[in-house]
Curated annotation (Swiss-Prot):
EC top class, as a word: hydrolase
Name this protein carries in UniProt: Elongation factor 4
tr-type G domain residues: 2-184
Species of provenance: Salmonella paratyphi C (strain RKS4594)
HAMAP family reported in the protein's UniProt record: LepA (MF_00071)
EC number: 3.6.5.n1
Domain of life, per lineage: Bacteria
GO biological process: positive regulation of translation
Length: 599
């Protein structure tokens, strides 16, 4: 056991985590040169296309250190994006140490800080690594000072390396073996294994990634899931070298995969403890904090025949992604679907893309909303995650919206732009600290504004230099109203949005104008209105298409023409009473972009 090292790699987006993982795998000979490819751990197509890591991946490698010993390294490559920070905290729970990778050109950014604090809270040994020293813009001395100033860990002898060229990566491994402590645990005690991650394999059922804390797990053992009390047979187990390799046992301190032929998706939830049925452990390991979704949206299959397969797909995906929340929902405009909760807009996009690609579904998404706390006049408190669930205005005593605490790190030059943006988003400044050339800003901004497009706007006003980390702070009373969209005097529930009263006029008008461009012209006039309660705040009309009924009259009597026009008018009127308006998918997506184009 003393030769096992478990560690994660944490860093801000694009500071080179996945490239460093590639080099480590190459140096330790996990894959032959022929099998090696860039970002070998980002196995999902989506990850490669976007160049981001979404799922944490684990690898077991052997490393022969300069002291002659061979060490077993279990390492987990983690995502850097703020929407996936729960993946990071789960990975860290399985480790004793973490490599904090910082780009020697960019310096410390908000996510570096957030992930590092998560690691420190879990009492992990943090080893700073300065990456990308081959870049002409690299300034390792300045960045080492920044790490000490902002993060507060000693970085005077931080390892310097370039993951791209491979310089200094061996030093990283040597430092790692020296500084990160071996796992603690009792190899002879009762088995306790923590499930770090699971995914669904069509042939094997549920595959779980586990970290053995105490005891040993052998092939063929009877395994008991502590939260459900179910017992299963350990059919196959092994490690990733990134390839799946079978082993006969997993020892104390190791990280590996396990297949128990669990067919039920909820059979082995992430964060649960596995123990042996013969000699069970007395208590479960502390699991993970449940993450609360911040953004909710309705997902509906385009054809209602897909509902069953959509439900199965969501089940399989939620096994792999513990933070996805979903419940059935029906809408008069869109039929049956699910109300899903996500950690942020990127998370929502990724989930939708994964459902469409991996499970071959066609989906319609409604506008994302956050959770509001509503106190009714009957003094009840309810939580509303969709505009259609909001009680009527005269039943609401107080409506409170969620406030997010946003920590931003940015160069001084962009301070003015960013402050202007925060004020526009109804933000309140709570703190501002200068660290050399960097400024750390803390703002309290309504969550609805943060999840909409704050991140994109922050990046564009600061030319990509500002970085953001946010978390939910509290609910605060606010003057929010629901803007309904009426098409030919019928409310379309899927198009409603909740917004602040100050912005409601402009949002309503903008939405109506957008809808006017997107709804195709029909044989009759379509009135599109935005309303707060019964008060109409904006209207526009999609003009009807009409046939020229006078084409066949050459000159002739005016009363003949009047008769024809009158007849057409009556026909249109009758059509309007019974006609339905087909809304294209773009119309539902229009709400997503309200408030973006005019800035």
């Amino acid at each position: 056991m003393k030769n096992i090292r478990n560690f994660s790699i944490i860093a801000h987006i694009d500071h080179g985590k996945s490239t460093l993982s590639d080099r480590i795998i190459q140096i330790c000979g996990g894959l032959s040169d022929r099998e090696m490819e860039a970002q070998v751990l980002d196995s999902m197509d989506l990850e490669r296309e976007r160049g981001i890591t979404i799922k944490a991946q684990s690898v077991t490698l052997d490393f022969k250190a300069s002291d002659g010993e061979t060490y077993q390294l279990n390492f987990i490559d983690t995502p850097g994006h703020v929407d996936f920070s729960y993946e990071v905290s789960r990975s860290l729970a399985a480790c004793e140490g973490a490599l904090l990778v910082v780009d020697a050109g960019q310096g410390v950014e908000a996510q570096t800080l957030a992930n590092c604090y998560t690691a420190m809270e879990m009492d992990l040994e943090v080893v700073p690594v300065l990456n990308k020293i081959d870049l002409p813009a690299a300034d390792p001395e300045r960045v080492a000072e920044e790490i000490e100033d902002i993060v507060g860990i000693d970085a005077t002898d931080a390892v310097r390396c370039s993951a791209k060229t491979g310089v200094g990566v061996t030093d990283v491994l040597e430092r790692l073996v020296r500084d990160i402590p071996p796992p603690q645990g009792d190899p002879d005690g009762p088995l306790q294994a923590l499930i770090i991650d699971s995914w669904f394999d069509n042939y094997l059922g549920v595959v779980s990634l586990v970290r053995i804390k105490n005891g040993t797990m052998r092939k063929g053992d009877k395994i008991k899931v502590m939260s459900t009390g179910q017992t299963y047979n350990a059919d196959r187990l092994g490690i990733f070298t990134p390839k799946q390799v079978d082993r006969s046992e997993l020892k104390c301190g190791e990280v590996g995969w396990l297949v128990c032929a669990i067919k039920d998706i909820l059979g082995a939830p992430v964060g649960d403890t596995l123990t042996s049925a013969r000699n069970p452990a007395e208590k479960a390991l502390p699991g993970f904090k449940k993450v609360k979704p911040q953004v909710y949206a309705g997902l509906f299959p385009v054809s209602s025949d897909d509902y069953e397969s959509f439900r199965d797909a969501l089940g399989k995906l939620s096994l792999n992604d513990a933070s996805l929340f979903y419940e059935p929902e029906s809408s008069s405009a869109l039929g049956f679907g699910f109300r899903c909760g996500f950690l942020g807009l990127l998370h929502m996009e990724i989930i939708q893309e994964r459902l469409e690609r991996e499970y071959d579904l066609d989906l319609i998404t409604t506008a994302p909303t956050v959770v509001y706390e509503v106190e009714t006049t009957a003094k009840e408190t309810i939580y509303v995650d969709s505009p259609s669930k909001l009680p009527p205005l005269n039943n609401i005593y107080e409506l409170r919206e969620p406030i997010a605490e946003c920590h931003m790190l940015l160069p001084q030059a962009y301070l003015g732009n960013v402050i202007t943006l925060c004020i526009e988003k109804r933000g309140v400044q709570t703190n501002m600290v200068y660290h050399g050339n960097q400024v750390a800003l803390t703002y309290e901004i309504p969550m609805a504004e943060v999840v909409l497009d704050f991140f994109d706007r922050l990046k564009s006003t600061s030319r990509g230099y500002a970085s953001l980390d946010y978390n939910f702070k509290r609910f605060q009373a606010s003057d929010m109203v629901r803007v309904d969209v009426l098409i030919n005097n019928e409310r379309v529930d899927a198009l409603a949005l909740i917004t602040h009263r100050d912005n409601s006029q402009s949002r309503g008008r903008e939405l109506v104008e957008k809808m006017k461009d997107l709804i195709p012209r029909q044989q009759f006039d379509i009135a599109i209105q935005a309303a707060i309660g019964t008060h109409i705040i904006a209207r526009s009309t999609v003009k009807q298409l009409r046939k020229n009924v006078l084409a066949k009259c050459y000159g002739g009597d005016i009363s003949r023409k009047k008769k024809l026009l009158q007849k057409q008018k009556e026909g249109k009127k009758r059509m309007k009473q019974i006609g339905n308006v087909e809304l294209p998918q773009e119309a539902f997506l229009a709400i997503l972009h309200v408030g973006k184009d005019n800035k």
